[in-house]
Amino acid sequence: MSHRILLVDDEVDILEFVRYNLVREGYEVFTAENGAEALKVAAECRPHLILLDMMMPVMDGAQTCRAIRRNPVLKDTMVVFLSALGEEGQQLAGFDVGADDYLTKPIKMKLLVSRVQAILKRIDADRPPEKAPA
């Protein structure tokens, strides 16, 4: 079974680069360019994991993560921030709004893929993933 990942970033080059590499690893990848769009896509595709940029227009990563945690359907979805904001306080703020992990840009693909694999392995061990709505 293919895991569903929602990748959210307002930089199209990053979306395409990360999506390409995750698809090569066998994941089904959905994308959104801001938080508001991400919430709509997440409600439709029910991702196992959300990779979320912090700085975006319309709705930033912190607002998006808070909304995910308040949503009864999405609240248990794993969220990993991928952000250029790398200071300790900024990372702690990400955890404060509900992130499960925080990686800084520039993205190191091998590290990201390893982190994704580890998270999804834990998800599979904890509970069977839900099916996407028909």
Q: Where do the language-model regions lie?
A:
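CheY-like receiver
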Residues: 123-134
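C-terminal output helix
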Residues: 106-117
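Acidic, metal-coordinating helix/loop segments flanking the phosphotransfer/catalytic sites
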Residues: 31-49
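Charged docking surfaces used in two-component/phosphorelay signaling
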Residues: 16-24
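Receiver (REC) domain active-site loop signature in two-component systems and cognate sites
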Residues: 56
